[in-house]
Amino acid sequence: MADDGTIPVEPRVLSIQSHVVHGYVGNRSAVFPMQLLGLEVDVLNTVHFSNHTGYKKFRGERMTSEQLENVVAGLEENDLLHYTHLLTGYVGNPALLRAITDTLRKLRRQNPSSLYVCDPVMGDDGKLYVPPELGTSIIVSLSMLIFSHPCAVDIYRDEVLPLADIITPNQFECELLSDMTLTSDADAIAACRKLHALGPRIVVVSSFTPPKEPHRLWLYASQAVGQGLSNTFKMEVPRLPAYYSGTGDLFAALLLSWLTRHPSNLKLALETVVATVQAVMRRTNDAQSANRTFVRTYERTTTSFTPSYWYVGELKLIQSRRDIEFPTAAHQPEGAAALVAAGVTVVFLTDDKDDVVRYTLSSPDVILS
């Protein structure tokens, strides 16, 4: 595919993740933006819920591995497995996760260059969505994403990542997969390098909060360049005073979309993704600031789960369609200044013999060149 913003080969994405009737998480958050950006998207839903689980109640059904295999068999029988991309988010159980790896192998028999973008959803904020000691029990979490078995970490690490081209873990998921604690740039580089060694050529840590600076939010991106080395940079993103389910799903879908247009320019793609997500979140925050809804969820302590209250708001995705189609980002003349004005900064990190050298570029023309 060309790297000039054109798409000479029609991309077709198979998106396997959650679905809700009301709201925007999982496929509901991912499919619309990909279609707006010119991608054909086929959808396979791992759950079908009334709403995301941040609400006080939800109902619905979960897909089994047998059901997924049956659907994929139907596609295969009709010679419909010609996909250029596979995108996965929330999966739900180890058997289903393994069935997805089998599906990817079938896709690559049809198209060996099929690109796999994996969001390895397992937890956030220092905890699994379901704690290991509860086995297959279910705890209501703020996120749509509920994981139900501790061995998921091993399956992702040993079976999924070797097949993935791009992964988008959050800080906690990156720590689980790399078996490291992230506290610094050096830690992030080392963790990304460990994940590169497992298979993915691009690792994007979609959120990182410095231990002593909880008000700051960073994104790390690393691209393997061979011989155990990688090019790494980070972006500081403004933290809004609200939590919106579905932003991670939106992020991964946008990254897939913009890397389709710019496969050789990770920095440009990510700048565009961040600008878009920020625009959607700001539009959502502005629209809902006068009508906030708080719901009861549960936070885990060292010995139990205690109730807490979070603001739950649905992304204004439809209202943000022009922000998605025509993002103010690096590829537009006014994009550099707008991104900097929004508070986004870019820092390039390089490593030489395990030493970290930081280059902070303050000029918009340099940052986004």
Regions found by a protein language model. Give the residues of each.
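Short glycine/threonine-rich catalytic loop with a Thr-x-Gly-x-Asp
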Residues: 237-255
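Glycine-rich phosphate/adenosyl-contacting loop at the front of the ribokinase-like
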Residues: 1-63, 311, 316-337, 342-345, ...
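A short helix->loop->beta-strand "cap" motif at the edges of active sites that frequently abuts
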Residues: 107-116, 198-201
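Charged C-terminal helix
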Residues: 267-369
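Short acidic, glycine-rich surface-loop motifs adjacent to enzyme active sites
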Residues: 82-93, 119
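Short Gly/Thr/Asp-enriched flexible loops that form oxyanion-binding sites at enzyme active sites
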Residues: 95-106, 215-218
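Conserved phosphate/ATP/ADP-binding segment of small-molecule kinases
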Residues: 131-232, 240, 259-267, 275-276
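Glycine-rich, highly charged phosphate/nucleotide-binding loops
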Residues: 60-76
